Amino acid sequence: MATSVGHRCLGLLHGVAPWRSSLHPCEITALSQSLQPLRKLPFRAFRTDARKIHTAPARTMFLLRPVPILLATGGGYAGYRQYEKYRERELEKLGLEIPPKLAGHWEVALYKSVPTRLLSRAWGRLNQVELPHWLRRPVYSLYIWTFGVNMKEAAVEDLHHYRNLSEFFRRKLKPQARPVCGLHSVISPSDGRILNFGQVKNCEVEQVKGVTYSLESFLGPRTCTEDLPFPPATSCDSFKNQLVTREGNELYHCVIYLAPGDYHCFHSPTDWTVSHRRHFPGSLMSVNPGMARWIKELFCHNERVVLTGDWKHGFFSLTAVGATNVGSIRIYFDQDLHTNSPRHSKGSYNDFSFVTHTNREGVPMRKGEHLGEFNLGSTIVLIFEAPKDFNFQLKTGQKIRFGEALGSL
């Protein structure tokens, strides 16, 4: 009887003649009981040839399938991350160095495809919007609480004084808040955290321990526009040697990360003369320590402004590196500099010389003098030559404030 019922059900679905008159009452009861569980399924009704047929759409099942897939993928990734953290903790207990895990080419390309420059320009315009007087205190208080801003150091502590976020980010400090150390030859140009420092051994400079960037890619090629006497470099070592202009000197570097809650202005780290500016339009990826450990040559990918010149021991450079929502880099004495502009294309650079017929020396800067500002947190990189007995007085990861000593002879 089950076979007979099955055939007649198939006939029903294919539009065979009325079935109630041809089925035995026992068969009708059996069919009704067999179809009872199907009534609980999500059926949809539609009309075909004037007959209403109930059928479960295939799309419903398709929509349900990604849910367990996403759950399994997310759970697997979370488990993998927990395993990595456990492994790092065990290596730390054993006193072993944790090797950095670098992003692959496709991961970097995917990150660079995000329109961070456009988003940063939008953020910059939002920062210029004047806030209502009643809204300023709650907005700024939230920012202060989130990033640990010390408003007692601000020249103006009244939050209602700052008309927009941009003014708040660029707030000035009280004169006594950052005393400049006069005993050391190089001071910190900004508040921040020391990511790395030391002597440049070869053409690869460490942005953080174990992760490097190319010295020539970062500073750009030496050209005649910089008014330097030596020819273009033909190799990595020759490029480094060109930066060291005096016999017996070595090349040094220091990387300082500015967090969003830090004082956003930067100052001259020593007495020197700025002769040249090179602007690299580029991406605006995050430069926080985690990203610096993940992306090789991160500083070479990002937009940056390289200031080069001379101090009493030879070559000296300060580079302001942009980041997400930090497309605006301002140099106070350079009115022609416009960063994160749509007319600038990635992969190029723009040179400007401060040495002219009327000014053969460039722009003299005194130690501690205001030099420029970011619109939010970012990174400062110092690369300079000094005698071999130059010593940094730093520890990797330490917090530092503008005016404190970096190193001396």
Swiss-Prot record:
Pathway assigned in UniProt: Phospholipid metabolism; phosphatidylethanolamine biosynthesis
Taken from the record's topology, the Mitochondrial intermembrane segments are 83-409
**Principal subcellular localisation of the protein:** mitochondrion
The portions of this protein that span the membrane are 64-82
Protein family (similarity comment) = Belongs to the phosphatidylserine decarboxylase family. PSD-B subfamily. Eukaryotic type I sub-subfamily.
Oligomer status and interactors:
Heterodimer of a large membrane-associated beta subunit and a small pyruvoyl-containing alpha subunit.
Under the heading HAMAP family, the entry gives: PS_decarb_PSD_B_type1_euk
Specify the protein name: Phosphatidylserine decarboxylase proenzyme, mitochondrial
- Species annotation: Pongo abelii
Q: Which gene encodes it?
A: PISD
